[in-house]
Swiss-Prot record:
PANTHER family: A1 CISTRON SPLICING FACTOR AAR2-RELATED (PTHR12689), PROTEIN AAR2 HOMOLOG (PTHR12689:SF4)
Organism whose genome encodes this protein: Saccharomyces cerevisiae (strain ATCC 204508 / S288c)
Leftover remarks: Present with 7330 molecules/cell in log phase SD medium.
Protein name: A1 cistron-splicing factor AAR2
Classification via Pfam families: AAR2, AAR2_1st
Gene Ontology cellular component list: cytoplasm; U5 snRNP
Record PTM text: Phosphorylated on serine and tyrosine residues.
Name of the coding gene: AAR2
Region (Leucine-zipper): 261-282
Phosphothreonine: residues bearing it: T274, T345
Subunit details: Heterodimer. Interacts with PRP8 (via RNase H homology domain and MPN domain), competing with BRR2 for the same binding site. Component of a U5 snRNP complex that contains at least the U5 snRNA, PRP8, SNU114, AAR2, SMB1, SMD1, SMD2, SMD3, SME1, SMX2 and SMX3, but is not a component of the U4/U6-U5 tri-snRNP complex.
Cellular compartment(s): Cytoplasm; Nucleus
Main subcellular location of this protein, as a coarse class: cytoplasm
InterPro entries: AAR2 (IPR007946), AAR2_C (IPR033648), AAR2_C_sf (IPR038514), Aar2_N (IPR033647), AAR2_N_sf (IPR038516)
Length: 355
């Protein structure tokens, strides 16, 4: 077990540790969270009482340092810091515990939900997606865009003749560097296999993604889980797009190892089970889920996911699913600029359009 002390709580805030949260009043004598399980990554997240739209937080692994939270009045944020003096850190923690000013990490539930939500998420992979190498923890907030979103916006601005720069373009530390998934790219569609690769993404999934970029299914699932959690905790739109794209890529492939399908079904079950119902309109794309569960190659492989979706979100399912198609974020101008119909187009993952 480990501890994250807080130096103070000068403003009212909702504090979350993993999937649990609680409110702290202004200047309440609160000094941290103790008994955090070691062995998983964790996330501490914040939402200020006077700023309902902004959510932010820090991913960390207790084994990688002595972390504490300090409020920065200049930026108006609770910031994670690292104390490199181990003895000093232990003395501070002991003092706060003695004064009973810390809350305990909630008792692990029967299903060990946090393990199931983060089974494949590793801190070293997080730090590659959230590129801020000087820290042993990673900051994420609701406003962060993905590198791929920035490229799409940059391309659109250039085509419109604008000199404006895409937000976060020059600040990779404030972007999420998820793996680019582009179904129209040269990597996805091989010369001589255009129709095959257009209809069935097995080559793109198995050869390009699993064998090439990710090296194995564990790394693939790690990014999928991380994207979901960033979408859920921070309402991060780009993360929601990445989560849907990675699910869609598997479901659009006829050839997928059975162990991978079984694990995907388990992962999605716990994700949908944990997702707060009030977020469904924002984070669940009706079109994508209908395709995956009822029209895709893998429509008979996700039994647990289908069951919990039908029980929890019946209003999202079963609407003309056989004829639904993905709506890609590709403009007419981008089509006109292609040398041929299979040249890659810069897209922000799979962009799904709500009806």
């Amino acid at each position: 077990m480990n501890t994250v002390p807080f130096t103070s709580a000068p403003i009212e805030v909702t504090i979350g540790i993993d999937q649990y949260s609680f409110n702290v009043k202004e200047n309440q004598p609160f000094h941290g969270i103790k008994d955090i399980p070691i062995g998983h990554v964790h996330v501490i997240h914040f939402q200020h009482a006077d700023n309902s739209s902004m959510r932010y937080g820090y991913w960390f692994d207790c084994r990688m340092g002595n972390f504490y939270i300090q409020y920065d009045p200049k930026d108006g944020l609770y910031k994670m810091m690292e104390e490199r003096d181990g003895a000093k850190f232990e003395n501070i923690v002991h003092n706060f515990k003695e004064r009973q000013m810390m809350v305990s990490y909630p008792k692990i539930d029967e299903d060990d939900t946090w393990y199931n939500l983060t089974e494949f998420v590793q801190m070293d992979k997080i730090r590659k997606i959230v590129r801020k190498d000087e820290n042993q923890f990673s900051y994420v907030d609701s406003s962060m865009t993905t590198v791929q979103e920035n490229e799409l916006l940059k391309s659109s601005l250039q085509k419109a003749g604008s000199k404006m720069e895409a937000k976060n373009e020059d600040d990779p530390a404030h972007s999420l560097n998820y793996t680019v998934i582009n179904f129209k790219s040269r990597e996805a569609i091989r010369p001589g296999h255009e129709m095959e690769d257009f209809l069935d993404k097995s080559y793109y999934l198995n050869t390009v993604m699993l064998q090439g970029i990710f090296k194995n299914s564990s790394n693939y699932f790690g990014e999928l889980q991380f994207a979901f959690l960033n979408a859920m905790f921070f309402g991060n739109y780009g993360s929601s797009l990445q989560w849907h794209a990675m699910i869609e890529l598997i479901c659009s492939s006829a050839t997928v190892p059975k162990h991978m399908l079984d694990k995907l079904d388990e992962i999605l079950y716990y994700q949908i089970k944990t997702l707060p119902e009030q977020y469904s309109d924002i984070l669940l794309n009706e079109r994508v889920w209908n395709i995956c569960l009822y029209s895709s190659f893998q429509k008979n492989s996700l039994h647990n996911t289908e069951k919990i979706m039908e029980n929890k979100y019946p209003e999202l399912l079963g609407k003309d699913n056989e004829d639904d198609a993905l709506i890609y974020g590709i403009s007419d101008e981008e089509r006109d600029d292609e040398d041929d119909e299979h040249n890659p187009t810069i897209v922000g993952g799979l962009y799904y359009q709500r009806p």
